[in-house]
Regions:
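N-terminal initiation segments
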Residues: 1-159
Length: 159
């Protein structure tokens, strides 16, 4: 376990431990395939680097909230971290066509078939990452204070 943690020396290497480059290659392939199926005259070729930039923008947008997506690129309140990563038109085009699975090989019984490959790959990667099991259960920590959502549980071992 220590060897793996030592090689994860940066945030980016930890990110790629969960979201490997093969996943981005597969998403780029599926997105390009979908683009060719929907608009064969002018297909939108997606590169792996574009997807990494897209995910970086989405992650940053999930932390810094603005009312509209275009606000991240606006001249008045624009966020430099996002504007330097990719242009707004490229972001919105990629957002409209991103695909994780081929629609032709869809399993109609699976409600999540459109994102199933993404879920499976991330679960597989998370199972490979070692972790320490540090857990503090509520019942181990006695609490005598008051709280609005506190419930009386008569069989709780620590009261």
């Amino acid at each position: 376990m220590d060897e793996l943690l030592d090689c994860l020396d940066s945030e980016l290497s930890y990110f790629y431990q969960i979201f490997p480059k093969e996943l981005f290659q597969e998403i780029a392939y599926q997105t390009t395939l979908y683009s060719m199926q929907t608009n064969p005259e002018t297909p939108f070729a997606v590169k792996e680097e574009d997807l990494v930039s897209f995910v970086a923008c989405v992650l940053y947008m999930s932390i810094v909230k603005l009312p509209s997506t275009r606000d991240y690129w606006s001249s008045s309140i624009g966020i430099a971290h996002v504007t330097n990563i990719m242009p707004v038109n490229g972001f919105e085009k990629l957002k409209s066509i991103i695909h994780f699975a081929d629609n032709n090989s869809a399993d109609k019984d699976d409600k999540l078939f459109k994102i199933r490959p993404l879920i499976n790959k991330i679960n597989e990667q998370l199972n490979n990452i070692p972790f320490e099991e540090n857990l503090a259960y509520e019942q181990i920590i006695p609490f005598k204070g008051r709280h609005l959502i506190k419930q009386y549980i008569p069989k709780k071992p620590h009261k």
